[in-house]
Amino acid sequence: MNETGVVLTDIRKSFGSLEVIHGIDLRIAEGSFVVFVGPSGCGKSTLLRMIAGLEEVTDGEIEIKGRNVTDLDPSDRGIAMVFQSYALYPHMSVRENLAFGLKMARTETAEIDARVKAASAILKIDHLLDRRPGQLSGGQRQRVAIGRAIVRKPDVFLFDEPLSNLDAELRVSMRIEIARLHRELGNTMIYVTHDQTEAMTLADRIVVLRDGRVEQEGTPREVYENPANIFVAGFIGSPRMNLLGAIWLGNGRVRVAGSEMSVPIAAENLQIGDKVFFGARPEHLFVADGRAESIPAKVDFAEYLGGTQYLYCQLADGQPLIAEYRSGPAVNAGSTIMLSVDDNKRRLFSADGRRLT
């Protein structure tokens, strides 16, 4: 996976005088699974459609497997796209839907039959070939849509929120199916979603987008454990990272809601009294038994989820905080607990949102 599959160089997109994609540079390794994730309107689908050739590039270049495809038609780019709407022909059987694109490309009948047979076997839809889309479940229709992409034998698969129309249980099973498909085929896959769970579970690398810009690129672990800024910290993770207003005291210490906490950072670019944000994920908080560095928190609501409780708390200065509580006696609403944070999981952000540690 060292060769480059897709390269985006200073990609820009404008609608009239409004620029919506602002000079994006990305190198996507061949055979990798990359997920574009971000809130609605961040530009992720627009970026995918530019790679597909369905949206004109205002400026910049797109390469696929070393070939400049910026001005090529979608059919000449070596890509296949899977949409959230399935885009199946209702009057055709599954077999005919799978074969349609190949017939339009004047592929020989024997080759069409072989590709349809192979794709239906991979997706386990052999028994559905004579049915029409209206006779299929949502998950089955999505498999057929993916099958239409597979038969084209593309260099790159593009997925635009393919699971958004499915219920929660089906989304889980289809995530597993898509991950298995990637392992079997080994093609480069670029996947767009607003669902961070899909991003974390499917991706080799995640690209977090906001307002047409890349906020961070990295492995799921890198993005989760070391978010580049407050936006990424708050977007990736469920529940989100606690981001608490704090004051820099110098010598690697901050004051959070009246309590002092140490953080592994030098005083570079910080002045005593500067406002900062102290970050801690819910699962990195624990009830402190006599530990010096702890924060009192009043429990407003305790959410019991079997092996885990989520404690929705309020600090002395009114800031909200969520803690994950896995062991020990039950904690009830109205009680006050002392919370601390794993030393190596404490994060500090500047007032303008940059990660400092």
Regions picked out by a protein language model, each given a short descriptive name:
Residues 7, 27, 63, 338-340:
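ABC ATPase nucleotide-binding domain
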Residues 33, 74-231:
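ABC ATPase nucleotide-binding domains
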Residues 37-39:
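The feature captures the beta-strand-to-loop junction immediately N-terminal to the Walker
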Residues 45-48, 144:
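ABC ATPase nucleotide-binding domain helices that frame the ATP-binding cleft
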Residues 52:
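Helix-to-loop junction immediately C-terminal to a conserved catalytic motif
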Residues 60-68:
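Conserved ABC transporter NBD signature motif
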Residues 253-301, 329-357:
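Glycine/charge-rich catalytic "coupling/switch" loops of P-loop NTPases
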